[in-house]
């Protein structure tokens, strides 16, 4: 990472809830090969034992499935899935879920069942774990009770997904609500425009983040303005939601001025939001799913050919665009692509479980955290991830649900 143009601001990690940026209109679906199988998944509430010594297999003896969205909303997850397949060959099998997962739940479930129909598939890494994932896990476990499930960026509330998946990985969304306002203030923001829609605002962790945004915007002298955008899974689709953003950002800047920071809870809205912010000279602090790759390349016409997961290259290109648009000090993100990290670490950790490198249980927290840190450093060598357990509203810590936080990278 070329430190001469990057300034790092440590993001304080919060042990609160989780709430993935749920690519509110998840990536689309395509059926994946039915070459997959399972190891066992525990019944709700009970711990699952990992592969025994007798069951421990070489890489050729098991497969790990990856389920992602399509590239229509964001291609990071599917790009990382393809990279894992390039790395491990036939050991990795991939599939996708439908763009309209809220109305095509049966397709989402059937794709997971097809993957699990291959007895060699012992674990499935799911990112983003959109609504319907918990039901799909239940269906798979009717015939594959020992299948290992690692769910990244869940679109279902913790009380729904936590009892189903063995491990849940998520950005610390409530924590982001704490750290975004002071970051935005340092970038010169006086107003924060928050784009969302009723479906997203029914999710516990998005609500928790929003509550923190209200509190910490007030503490930092920033006016929080809520704007309801079209739901990308609604009648107007992703195209309609994106068009709304392109038309509304200039209106908001005309009303509140250029010292306005923009945030949306939806992945599909990031590209038009970034483009409009750059074109109109506003402020951009963080995506819903923080990553240097999330929407920046398409929004700013950055050619990624041959550099699909090259963070150093991406940071250099982003700095060049910031310089070109005169946006110095007004744009930031994380140096680690969170959803790519969840796919990468999910596969690497599942492999360790299946090869008997954990403590004999599917959840070996020490090994999992070490794996996440190792994978993060593949993107940014000096990355330091903060990893905490999700704590529910009653103060109960959930051992299998991990909230992840990284540092801000501000382009000077």
Regions found by a protein language model. Give the residues of each.
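Periplasmic-binding protein-like
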Residues: 64-68, 119-130, 147-152, 193-194, ...
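An alpha-beta-alpha
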Residues: 81, 173-226, 350, 373
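Hinge/cleft segment of the Venus flytrap/periplasmic-binding protein
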Residues: 314-412
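Flexible loop/hinge segments that line or gate small-molecule binding clefts
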Residues: 140-173
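Hydrophobic alpha-helical segments within soluble ligand-binding/sensing domains
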Residues: 167-194, 244-247, 313-322, 337-354
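Extracellular/periplasmic periplasmic-binding protein-like sensory domains
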Residues: 217-224, 271-355
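Bacterial lipoprotein signal-peptidase II cleavage site
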Residues: 20-31, 35
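Extracytoplasmic "Venus flytrap"
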Residues: 57-84, 88, 93-111, 125-131, ...
């Amino acid at each position: 990472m070329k430190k001469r143009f990057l300034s790092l601001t440590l993001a304080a990690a919060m042990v609160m809830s989780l709430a993935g940026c749920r690519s509110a209109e998840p990536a689309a679906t395509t059926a994946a090969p039915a070459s997959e199988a399972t190891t066992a998944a525990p019944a709700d509430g009970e711990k699952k034992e990992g592969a025994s010594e007798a069951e421990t297999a070489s890489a050729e003896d098991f497969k790990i499935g990856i389920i992602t969205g399509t590239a229509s909303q964001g291609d990071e997850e599917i790009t990382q899935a393809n990279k894992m397949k390039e790395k491990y060959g036939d050991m990795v099998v991939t599939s996708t879920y439908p763009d309209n997962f809220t109305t095509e739940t049966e397709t989402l479930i059937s794709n997971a069942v097809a993957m699990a129909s291959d007895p060699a598939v012992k674990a499935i890494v799911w990112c983003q774990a959109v609504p319907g994932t918990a039901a799909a896990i239940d269906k798979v476990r009717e015939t594959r009770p020992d299948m290992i499930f690692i769910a990244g960026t869940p679109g279902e509330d913790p009380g729904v997904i936590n009892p189903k998946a063995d491990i849940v990985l998520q950005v610390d969304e409530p924590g982001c609500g704490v750290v975004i306002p002071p970051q935005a203030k340092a970038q010169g923001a006086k107003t924060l425009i928050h784009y969302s829609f009723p479906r997203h605002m029914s999710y516990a962790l998005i609500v928790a983040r929003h509550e923190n945004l209200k509190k910490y915007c007030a503490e930092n002298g920033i006016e929080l303005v809520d704007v309801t955008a079209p739901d990308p899974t609604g009648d107007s689709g992703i195209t309609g939601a994106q068009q709304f953003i392109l038309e509304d950002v200039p209106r908001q800047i005309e009303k509140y001025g250029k010292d306005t920071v923009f945030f949306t809870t939806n992945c599909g809205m990031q590209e038009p939001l970034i483009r409009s912010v750059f074109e109109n000279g506003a402020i951009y602090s963080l995506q819903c799913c923080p990553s240097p790759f999330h929407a920046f390349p398409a929004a700013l016409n950055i050619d990624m050919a041959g550099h699909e997961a090259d963070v150093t290259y991406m940071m250099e290109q982003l700095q060049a665009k910031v310089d070109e648009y005169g946006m110095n000090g007004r744009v930031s993100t994380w140096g680690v692509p969170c959803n790519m990290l969840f796919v990468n670490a999910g596969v690497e950790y599942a492999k360790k479980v299946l090869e008997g490198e954990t403590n004999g249980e599917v959840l070996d927290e020490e090994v999992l955290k070490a794996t996440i840190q190792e994978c993060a450093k593949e993107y940014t060598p000096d990355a330091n991830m903060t990893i905490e357990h999700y704590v529910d509203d009653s103060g109960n810590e959930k051992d299998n649900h991990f909230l992840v936080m990284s540092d801000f990278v501000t382009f000077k």
